[in-house]
Regions:
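Short amphipathic alpha-helix that is part of the acyltransferase structural core
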Residues: 8-60, 67, 72-77, 81-82
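Feature marks short, surface-exposed loop/turn motifs that line or immediately flank catalytic pockets
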Residues: 46, 89-93, 156
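Short secondary-structure capping micro-motifs at structural edges
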Residues: 60-62, 71-72, 97-104
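Conserved acyl-donor/pantetheine-binding loop and adjacent beta-alpha core of acyl/acetyltransferases
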Residues: 81, 85-115
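Conserved acetyl-CoA-binding loop-helix of GNAT-fold acetyltransferases
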Residues: 115-118, 124-138
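Conserved GNAT acetyl-CoA-binding A-motif
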Residues: 139-154
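Conserved active-site tyrosine of GNAT-family acetyltransferases
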Residues: 159-161
């Protein structure tokens, strides 16, 4: 059984990857307690579409955002987190029943897009598109990753042409 480490520090550690005026995208090296409330609040918007299991907790933030090999990005507007996207190697979520259905399960070559959300009031400004593009570009450069997968709501992908 995998042992979870709850090394929770107060401060997040991140690197700014892209910015434009008051908007920026950061690659999270470590999600700290200071950002937990914003991440949890934003994740509540996923519950409307995907159910309560999509709402983040301290445990899921530590498990996925701080996991070696994961690819978590946050979007900030005027220093407030307005969205995030996180990729996790499929091999690292083997306990999820649906992960075993992935055609590349067990090959250690696939990144699963675990969650992607931008607050509604910031949609229509290109922030979600920029966040997704940065994520995809970084995912393509990750050693050993050949495929990127995930679950999306029907019709949503047409917004990312």
């Amino acid at each position: 059984m995998e042992q979870l480490s709850f090394d929770i520090s107060r401060s997040s550690k991140s690197r700014i990857i892209a910015s434009s005026g008051v908007f920026q995208i950061e690659l999270l090296d470590h999600a700290g307690e200071e950002d937990f409330p914003q991440l949890i609040e934003i994740s509540k918007h996923l519950a409307k579409e995907y159910g309560d299991h999509a709402v983040l907790t301290k445990a899921t933030i530590c498990r996925y955002f701080n996991k070696p090999g994961s690819l978590p990005f946050i979007a900030r507007y005027r220093n407030e987190i307005i969205g995030y996207i996180i990729g996790i190697p499929v091999k690292d979520i083997h306990s999820e029943p649906w992960a075993r259905l992935d055609e590349n399960f067990g090959k250690a070559n696939t990144l699963y897009t675990y969650a992607f959300v931008v607050l509604s009031k910031y949609k229509g400004h290109g922030y979600a598109k920029m966040l997704k593009r940065v994520y995809l570009n970084w995912a393509k450069k990750k050693d050993g990753i050949r495929f990127i997968t995930g679950h999306v709501k029907a019709g949503i992908s047409k917004n990312f042409t």
